[in-house]
Amino acid sequence: NGGTVILTNRSGVKDKFNKCIMQQLPTVYRSLVGAYIEEYDPIGYDNATIRLSDGSVYKCRQWCDVIQPETAETVATYNSEFYKGKTAITRNHYGNGTVYYIGTVCEKSLYNRIVKDILVDTGIPYVDGLPDNVEITTRTGDGIEARFIFNNTNKEQSLMLDGGEICLAPFEMKTDIKKM
């Protein structure tokens, strides 16, 4: 019925009983992903790089799936190593939904960017610059919007929201209620 799924490298390797599935990766997810893994390289903690279509470059490490798109579109390609120019991240439209496959372990800023792009594409509100481990949940109904702002850390956190600064004590939650 729609939605967005993000799968990462090694998805589909094992079944629910922890037994290896003896098929080409991503095994049972191949039709969802719209691609298959042509080859992979366990690079450990050495860094490789990937490039998005806008030219921005991000580091990746540990594992590099060389993806062969079938129905999926390429979101990013490897920018180094013997697989330079090969697909690293895909997006596939499946039914009414979208499936992303990230074939490597990326730096945090790339994950943040991918999630932000997905949120914007799906119309889900996104707060730029939200500190790590601070979350905002919004509920609406009966002409009211209620936002719950959680600090899930043991340190004081501050953030800008609607042009004003909000300071949160360790593990504090604040509620912001507005009429719509």
Positions of the model-derived regions?
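A conserved amphipathic helix/loop scaffold
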Residues: N1-M180
